[in-house]
Every structure is written in C-alpha cells, then in structure tokens.
Amino acid sequence: MKNTINIQDQFLNQLRKEGIQVTVFLLNGFQLRGYIKGFDNFTVLLEVQGKQQLIYKHAISTFAPERNIHFETEQ
C-alpha cells in the first residue's frame, strides 16, 4: 500500500504546535483570527480572544497564517 501525504493535517498540526496565529476565511466572507487548538476530519477548534469556536471544515475557504510555516514532506 502506498503511503499518502496529508498536507491538510500536517499544515493544521504545525500551526497548532507552533502556536501561530491564523486568519480563517469562511465561505460566507466572515473572518476569524485566532489559534488552532485541535482538529479532526470535520472540524477545527479555534481559540479567538480567549474563547473557543468549533468551525466545520465545509464552511472554511482559506487558512492564512501570520507567518510561513515549514514542514517536511515524506517521499
């Protein structure tokens, strides 16, 4: 079986581990700025001004971190 790289999970996990602030753009145009505290296949837990918000991934358009992240991709 071929191992596949899940870029989405690696990206979100790196943002979480490094505590990088991220702007989340929703499909309705709304923006949330905060820190990723966790995620699963369907949701992202974002801390915004000390409060937690659970966002469904199907409502998200874009993640824009405040700075670039570096992560390794296995080949």
Curated annotation (Swiss-Prot):
Superkingdom of the organism of origin: Bacteria
GO biological process: one example: regulation of DNA-templated transcription
Residue span, Sm domain: 9-69
CC terms in the record's Gene Ontology section: cytosol
PROSITE patterns: SM
Disulfide bonds: none
CDD domains named in the record: Hfq
Keywords: RNA-binding, Stress response
Gene3D superfamilies for this protein: 2.30.30.100
One GO molecular-function entry: RNA binding
The keyword RNA-binding belongs to this UniProt entry's keyword annotation: yes
Listed HAMAP family: Hfq (MF_00436)
Subunit structure: Homohexamer.
Family according to the record: Belongs to the Hfq family.
Function in brief: RNA chaperone that binds small regulatory RNA (sRNAs) and mRNAs to facilitate mRNA translational regulation in response to envelope stress, environmental stress and changes in metabolite concentrations. Also binds with high specificity to tRNAs.
Name of the protein in question: RNA-binding protein Hfq
Organism: Geobacillus kaustophilus (strain HTA426)
